[in-house]
Amino acid sequence: MRPAAISVILPAYRASSVVATTVARIRSAMPGKEVEIIVVDDGSGDDTDLAASRAGADQVIKLQENRGKGAAVRAGMLNAVGSHFVFTDVDLAYDPSQIPALIDALESGADVALGSRRHPHSSEITSAPALRERGSRIFNQFTRLVLRSSYLDTQCGLKGFTADAAHAIFTRTKVDGFAFDVEVLHLAEKLSLKTTEVPVILDHIEQTTVRFIPQATRMLWDVLKIRMWSALGRYPDLTLRRG
């Protein structure tokens, strides 16, 4: 890979039926760009890893057990070789044509570029179910209260990082589940990284492999753990070293 490569990390769980199409769509969305696609199979137990390899993913990382989206994204980030890293959902709820906007923000000086469904210029093709949308808003309010953060949308599945920022953040993350996004943003604040929010277009696809209530309970508990770890100094050396 050339130094200017864009690394796209796809955490995948039981995604054998969609991963090949996803890999192809990401490549076609950035013609002329050197793109590294990393699929992290989060202990799917099906043929997700084989389908990703056959589709031409540059790296396929297979976790031996289902550890969670946070663990999968971390594994991809720590194995990526590009100068800009992006993670997105394998079901492409955010069309890959939106990735260049994140890269533009990073090249304009941001360390972290956050897709935000709450951005005034964001829109929806297909909305999330009402229960999930309400739950998302409550979770964001809870997160802002517990961590004293200012982010309106922590859980958007489209985020970009410079290589230095990604390394600084993901070598310190501890959360393996869906609340990892909150930990990522908390660490970005603690590391004094420059963040910017980018509008997105959401085309929601319901994830039948996600059990909403148990996951929501775990996410709330993980946010409390992030607060505790931060207060107890469990995150090491919060100093950004730029390459």
Where are the model-predicted features located?
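A conserved acidic beta->alpha catalytic loop
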Residues: 41-49, 92
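Donor nucleotide-sugar binding loop of glycosyltransferases
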Residues: 15-18, 44, 69, 95
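Cell-envelope/extracellular polymer assembly enzymes that use nucleotide-activated donors
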Residues: 5-7, 36, 183
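Short, well-formed alpha-helical segments that are part of the catalytic scaffolds
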Residues: 15-30
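Conserved donor nucleotide-binding strand/loop of the catalytic core
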Residues: 35-38, 49-79
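Catalytic donor-sugar/metal-binding loop of nucleotide-sugar-dependent glycosyltransferases
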Residues: 149-150, 172-176, 185-203
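Acceptor/aglycone-binding surface of glycosyltransferases and processive sugar-polymer synthases
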Residues: 63-79, 84, 96-178, 205-221, ...
